[in-house]
From Swiss-Prot:
This is DNA ligase. Its EC number is 6.5.1.1. PROSITE patterns: DNA_LIGASE_A1, DNA_LIGASE_A3. The active site is at K253. The keyword Nucleotide-binding applies. GO terms for biological process: cell division; DNA biosynthetic process; DNA recombination; DNA repair; lagging strand elongation. Its cofactor is Mg(2+). It catalyses: ATP + (deoxyribonucleotide)n-3'-hydroxyl + 5'-phospho-(deoxyribonucleotide)m = (deoxyribonucleotide)n+m + AMP + diphosphate. Signal peptide: none annotated. The gene is lig. The lineage of its organism: Archaea, Methanobacteriati, Methanobacteriota, Methanomada group, Methanobacteria.
Amino acid sequence: MTNTSYEKLVEVYEKISSTSSRLEKQDIIADFLMYIKETDADITYDITLLLQGKIFPPWSDKEMGISTQLIIKALSNLLGESTKSIENKLAEVGDMGEISEELIKNNKQVTFFKVPLTVKKVLSNLRKTESITGSKSQNKKINYLLELYTSASPLEAKYITRTITERLRIGVGEGTLVEAIAQAYNIDKEIIDRAYMLSNDLGEVASRAQESIESVKSLTITPGKPIKPMLAQLSPGIKESITEMKKVICETKYDGIRVQIHHYNNKTKIFTRRLENVTNALPEVVEYIEEALPSKDFIVEGEVIATKDNKPISFQYILQRVKRKYDIDKMREKIPLKVFLFDVLYYDKPTAELPIIQRRQLLEEIVTTSKNVELSTMKIVSQENYTEAEKLFTWSIDEGHEGIMFKDVTSPYSPGKRGKNMLKYKPLRETLDCVITGGTYGKGKRAKFFGSYLLSLLDEKTGEYKTLVHAATGMDDDLLASLTKRMEKLIISKSEQNVLFKPKVILEIAYSEIVESNEYESGYSLRFPAIKGVRDDIGLDEVDTLSKLHQMIDLQK
């Protein structure tokens, strides 16, 4: 077995980015996976991560903690160029990866200790930065970066930087990787797709695929390892949804954070829909769940809401609880929580592939309800009694909840999939979850704040973000200040008024209508956009897509 050079991976990155054809990208990745199987099979897991632009698995809560500013400092230390000069270049180009490539290419200094980089070395150095804390942590992180940049070729420097900034820009989405893994190891795509859905780990899927098809098929949901949530499409209307689905579970849609609760080895962990571990922030939820369910291995799913006088209050209050790291007991008294459970994905064994009607029955059998833990309010509805759904909708809104859900009674749980087996119906204006990719400073009293944000949707075919609209209304002074402080840490480049950001923060945007527009990359814009709030409960893989935009255009016709 060889120790695969990082240069070899970079060559693959360049080949992939040089073509716009998804099939060609798939072929390149499949060929590379076969090469790795034959020459360095132990790193298949890591290679699959790096092809996604990641260094940690998606279910891990580890992060590098390396900012663009830290990269600039490292390159400045290495090359003797001022940080201001590098910042100016970044403002002009907008891609820190390209800047890194250019700086290394133009470096006139001779390096006597240049050692060829390997995939293992790059990953090792980047992963080490995650655990560094303390007063000299920045210097230690810079030293790990310098080790890499000192030995890197210009192209290697470009992709090291892009991996750190989580913007690989090679146009590869999860779908392409699934297809490539299936092709490389000659396994049906459906088998690979199922294994990925149940494990949420393409690295694990690829590693098992190189062993055998049986190993892939044995992958399943495991307590302690969160999976992507099943997602809902928009409902065209109550009667229309029930007519199409025939028989449904109709249940209240709560305005809180969706959680996946895992109990295993006599401990309980709570994950958000973006797979973030928030167990420490919600200690009472752990207590409530351990009182409500038997001490067996299980995974249940539900919604945690904030309450006042036992009534639901704004979603933003529960976000305060989730993000809190200190004074948890004080916040626990200030913002009480309640749990509504609506699904069980594992109970002594996997249950996700059972029909939802059976999973609901199991949930009712195993949960002891209380004032702190309840099951979601639901009714089984068909075309003959669809008015029951209308009554539940009215009741849910009157009680301060968000709307209702429709779930086809025969449907299994499909992690990460958005399909017609689960629909959501809400009143008033529609919303889109958009990622902030740019901004503009305000004027007058608001000159030191970002007064408007450029928002984008995900192009699922390329993995890139396409601009959709500028939004400014809906921010009170507190949100204006807190969001500015947060976004300043994510600046990629800026001119006098305009700023580009690393895609990280997601906003929920309400609007009245989708209209065609040549001003934005998506080809559309929103009329009367208003910022409803920050969606810290979801990850970048749940940013709304161009496909959803087109679906909503069809619905408004």
